[in-house]
């Protein structure tokens, strides 16, 4: 999935057990008090409809569908994120019927061609629109059509986040004993003075990773 993430992402949330992650969040005392742990608008949508989606499958989510990323982009607003999900056998049809089931009937869905790839725009009941990029192997969803276009560009040009040496060097793959991992782009820090010649071009700035664990009292 990281081969889909545009290189300008400022942070990425990764999990390979999204259903368990939702259970962990629902088990927090703050969730039981109706104080939802905010991650993103897309994550809030996922949390709202996940149980219904799981209910539509006889054996729960597939191993592939449990793999999920959310990338965050500038400017930092609730709508500037992309959710990515792997798809296994039969998942394409499941997700397609699920989206159609819950999208608004007020406006018809629209289809756009972008560099030979199809972007679908689904109207939602709250008046917003979801841009979706489907393939048999994955889907990418965003409230911003331009971000889905960037996903397509990253995939076709092979210039994704995983193609950046600074990220690829840091990335070690998902650990099995954590609910999720957050990757954050650190701001660059200039070293030396402008008059120091080559030293002034030295920059400190890369990626950091933080593993997330949950108990009823806290996220750490």
For the regions a protein language model found, what residue spans apply to each?
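Generic beta-strand structural signal
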Residues: 113-114, 132-135, 214
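Long, internal scaffold/assembly segments composed of regular secondary structure
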Residues: 197, 201-220
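Structural boundary/hinge residues at secondary-structure and domain interfaces
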Residues: 1-121, 168-197, 203
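Generic recognition of long tandem-repeat/solenoid scaffolds
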Residues: 117-123, 216-220
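Beta-strand-connecting loop/turn residues
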Residues: 79, 116, 136-138, 217
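A conserved glycine-rich beta-strand in the N-terminal activation segment of trypsin-fold
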Residues: 125-194
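Contiguous hydrophobic, core-forming segments of folded domains
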Residues: 3-23, 28, 137, 143-169, ...
